[in-house]
Design a protein with these regions (language model features):
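Hydrophobic transmembrane alpha-helices and immediately adjacent juxtamembrane helices
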Residues: 1-273
Length: 273
């Protein structure tokens, strides 16, 4: 009985320390906002257009795939290109977070051993850098919206809570994958391979309407729900109740799992990195 009480007290103590770590990490926002921007900027040092290469690369991919697959799928390019662009841009954010989360603490290991600071600070920095990449890529959608005279109307406001759900889920995933991948170095390769398969199983290049008989496959795909709640408002739609409910439910579940996982392994990350 005493042993169970001690274990419960210890778990509660670890959870409180983890929450304090997250609060402390957020309080360091001036530092991680600067470091996140510097990380992106340093990748394109001495380049003429700098981080705008992100925008240019995404633009060329959208244009190339859009022209090709609109012919293959026999879809009007004016209808296909905006949908494809948003799908690729959102996938870039999701994929970047999941793949990059595996390297958070292996990259920050040196700094963690030399400077005492909240472990979550490095997660905040990473998520911020991914948002900066997303912002550069999002310029492609803005250009397409202007070219094709798109008017999503007031539904576009739903884009902001949708993006918040994606970012929160990304933060929670990073709290899990960061320590996990620091401990087991084969996990990043496994995740990288899985994400390549998931890309083709998610309606990014193709549309969900093209697979009506296998709708359950989409329902079981969490990436589909997150992409749709962002894509629909930008196309002037509200999104389905299923997509929103699934996205909110997944975010809450990830938050609960991440809190328990981070509370248990947060203190060991510095030894694994």
């Amino acid at each position: 009985m005493i042993e169970k009480s001690t274990m419960a007290t210890r778990a509660k103590s670890n959870t409180m320390r983890a929450l304090d770590d997250i609060r402390g990490g957020f309080d360091q926002r001036e530092l991680w906002l600067y470091l996140g921007w510097r990380e992106i900027k340093s990748q394109y040092s001495r380049s003429i257009i700098g981080p705008l290469w992100l925008t240019l690369s995404m633009g060329m991919m959208v244009l190339g795939l859009g022209v090709l697959y609109s012919e293959i799928l026999k879809i009007d390019v004016a209808n296909y290109l905006p949908r494809l662009a948003i799908g690729l841009i959102v996938w870039g954010l999701i994929n970047g977070i999941i793949i990059g989360a595996c390297r958070i603490f292996s990259v920050a290991g040196g700094a963690m051993r030399q400077i005492r600071m909240p472990v979550s600070m490095f997660i905040f920095q990473f998520i911020w850098s991914q948002l900066l990449v997303f912002a550069h890529n999002f310029l492609v959608y803005i250009i397409i919206a202007v070219v094709f005279l798109m008017n999503p109307g007031w539904n576009v406001l739903l884009f902001f809570p949708a993006l918040l759900l994606v970012v929160l889920s990304g933060f929670f995933i990073s709290m899990i994958l960061g320590p996990l991948c620091a401990r087991f170095r084969d996990v990043p390769m496994i995740i990288g391979s899985v994400m390549q398969i998931v890309f083709f199983m998610t309606p990014i290049i193709w549309s969900a309407d093209q697979m009506p008989r296998r709708a359950w496959v989409l329902t079981a795909n969490p990436f589909y729900h997150f992409i749709e709640i962002i894509r629909d408002p930008l196309l002037g739609k509200t999104g389905t109740a299923l997509n929103w409910t699934a996205s909110i439910g997944i975010t809450i579940a990830l938050g609960a799992i991440a809190t328990v996982f981070f509370a248990r392994y947060r203190a060991r990350v510095v030894y694994w990195s």
